[in-house]
UniProtKB/Swiss-Prot annotation:
One of its GO terms (cellular component) is HslUV protease complex. The lineage of its organism: Bacteria, Pseudomonadati, Pseudomonadota, Betaproteobacteria, Burkholderiales. This is ATP-dependent protease subunit HslV. Its EC number is 3.4.25.2. A double ring-shaped homohexamer of HslV is capped on each side by a ring-shaped HslU homohexamer. The assembly of the HslU/HslV complex is dependent on binding of ATP. SUPFAM superfamilies: N-terminal nucleophile aminohydrolases (Ntn hydrolases) (SSF56235). Protease subunit of a proteasome-like degradation complex believed to be a general protein degrading machinery. Pfam families: Proteasome. Signal peptide: none annotated. Allosterically activated by HslU binding. Disulfide bonds: none annotated. It is found in: Cytoplasm. It comes from Albidiferax ferrireducens (strain ATCC BAA-621 / DSM 15236 / T118) (Rhodoferax ferrireducens).
Length: 182
């Protein structure tokens, strides 16, 4: 059976006078092969009492499994994002069921932005931009330009980057969900 796939998830961290503003967004398109089966899926959400932003790309059922496991790690480690991500990837690499999951997570809190890969790696990009999914490279290029050459806020950059990705990537649509942290 074919997997549900294709999406764009982007998180942007922008320096503000008060610290950092963080936003994450994703499109709503879910495809099965070459057919769009849903256009308004919610692939980003707030976790751990609204203090952590997370989004997924990949097989939907696998992503929900990872969300649940990641949220359990956040609870266990009192919301410490990096520690929870590392502990999740330790499990991911040693658990036979988790090793077969085909999904990636983009996660962020007030201090860090991370990519948790399907290989069980934790990556922290240097520029505060995290992208995953089929339209990720397009959204990343747009966000880099907007972050470096405009005064747009993090949520504005996320929105515009998703719009640009949707114009290029056939697996990304214009139905967006955006979540923010102050």
């Amino acid at each position: 059976m074919e997997q549900f796939h294709g999406t764009t998830i982007i998180s942007v961290r922008r320096k503000t006078p008060e610290g950092y503003s963080v936003a994450i967004g994703g499109d709503g398109q879910v495809t099965l092969g070459n057919i769009v089966v849903k256009g308004t899926a919610r692939k980003v959400r707030k976790l751990y009492h609204g203090k952590v932003l997370a989004g997924f790309a990949g097989a939907t059922a696998d992503a929900f499994t990872l969300f649940e496991r990641f949220e359990a790690k956040l609870e266990k480690h009192q919301g410490h994002l990096v520690r929870a991500a590392i502990e999740l990837t330790k499990d991911w690499r040693t658990d036979r069921v988790l090793r077969r999951l085909e999904a990636m997570l983009a996660v962020a809190d007030s201090e860090a932005s991370l990519i948790i890969t399907g290989n069980g790696d934790v990556l922290e990009p240097e520029n505060g931009i995290v992208t995953i999914g089929s339209g990720g490279a397009y959204a990343q290029a747009a966000a880099m330009a907007l972050l470096n050459h405009t005064e747009m806020s993090a949520p504005e950059i996320v929105k515009k980057s998703l719009e640009i990705a949707a114009e290029i990537c056939i697996y990304t649509n214009m139905s967006h969900t955006i979540e923010t942290l102050p």
